């Protein structure tokens, strides 16, 4: 599901709220989450999951075209850990 599909689905379910208001709310929520993570804070949504930053240590990688070694710097990457309720719902679908 893309962001546009999410906005469209939410707007369809909440017909009393203009689509532009739904779009602005989704964009604001995602922006706030990105800002929170960029400040090093963790986001926890009970029953859904948590977002945090994980550190990837510096390492030697390879250029896929040439095979040459490339030194990669350490960096922080976003990480999502699903909550138990979400895992259970996913298992119902997948099982």
UniProtKB/Swiss-Prot annotation:
UniProt cross-references to InterPro entries, sorted A to Z: Hist_DNA-bd, Histone-like_DNA-bd_CS, IHF-like_DNA-bd_dom_sf, IHF_beta
How is this protein annotated for GO cellular component? Answer: chromosome; cytosol
Query: Which domain of life does the protein's organism represent?
Result: Bacteria
Can you supply a Gene Ontology BP term from the record? DNA recombination
Keywords for the protein's UniProt record, in alphabetical order: DNA recombination, DNA-binding, Transcription, Transcription regulation, Translation regulation
Entry's Gene3D superfamilies? IHF-like DNA-binding proteins
Cited Pfam families: Bac_DNA_binding (PF00216)
Enumerate the GO terms in the molecular function aspect: DNA binding; structural constituent of chromatin
Q: Membrane spanning segments where?
A: none
Q: Which SMART domains match?
A: BHL
Described purpose of this protein according to its UniProt entry: This protein is one of the two subunits of integration host factor, a specific DNA-binding protein that functions in genetic recombination as well as in transcriptional and translational control.
Quaternary form?
A: Heterodimer of an alpha and a beta chain.
| Family to which the UniProt record says this protein belongs | Belongs to the bacterial histone-like protein family.
Instruction: Return the protein name.
Output: Integration host factor subunit beta
